[in-house]
From Swiss-Prot:
The gene is kti12. The keyword ATP-binding applies. One of its GO terms (molecular function) is ATP binding. It comes from the Eukaryota. Gene3D superfamilies: P-loop containing nucleotide triphosphate hydrolases (3.40.50.300). Keywords: ATP-binding, Nucleotide-binding. It comes from Xenopus laevis (African clawed frog). It holds the Pfam family KTI12. ATP binds at G8, F9, P10, C11, S12, G13, K14, S15. This is Protein KTI12 homolog. The lineage of its organism: Eukaryota, Metazoa, Chordata, Craniata, Vertebrata. Belongs to the KTI12 family. InterPro entries: KTI12/PSTK, P-loop_NTPase.
Amino acid sequence: MPLILLCGFPCSGKSSRSQELQEHLEQSGRKVHIIGDHVLGVDRNAVYADSREEKDLRGSLRAAVERKLNKEDVVILDSLNYIKGYRYELFCLIKHVQTPHCLIHCITSPEVSSTWNQHRDKNEQYNQEIFDSLVQRFEFPDSRNRWDSPLFSVHKDEKLPLEQICNAIFHRKAPPPNQSTQMQPLSSTNFLHELDKVTQEVVTAVLSAQKTSIPGDVIMVPGASEKVQLPRILSMSELRRLRQQFISYTKLHPNENISQLANMFVQYLNQSIHG
């Protein structure tokens, strides 16, 4: 079912709007998934100070969105979504999945957002340098762009246009897929070989380590600095299913850095089994 994107300055009310949307949709019997930085438990100041970490975060959010998109549920992406190129990537994703979407721009002034930021708990605040940088880098949505449309721009004192949002996501046809979203972009035999090999090694390591592990343990796997966080014992069939999902996703969104495949798969496993 549909994807709802939130965008806006840091501390512009996106999470409050997401919760308001969730409550409204659940009252009508819809199942809603909210995905965002807070769900992944990231350190915002560390991530947004490092372009590589920020890129990894966007990839993790996109992967989490793709896992939840189906024919029944509504997915809300509660994040900055401040880069128009990233919003375009998500638009391509919904075209591939064949589901509608909309964008909600939470409008505040930098001064108001800065004040709201300062009133947050210390561990949830952006430091001022990061905050100012994100405000400066924000790329405003434009409803003339198909990836930013339909667009709902909501000021801080305005009510969400809930009826119009529901009409946009439930009574509008999904954008048709085009050749670029249907094509498999991979042609590198070496990449495919490494993808298959690395993911199989991780699965084998997890199955082996589980024999002497208990829920709550962390498992080291070959080729990864990330560790698998084990909330419960995972069956071979579940691991095989998650491995196949990861391979399918990575074929559509290839990463040139083969050395990071193991870490990416471990992150995918952790997000899937804890989600």
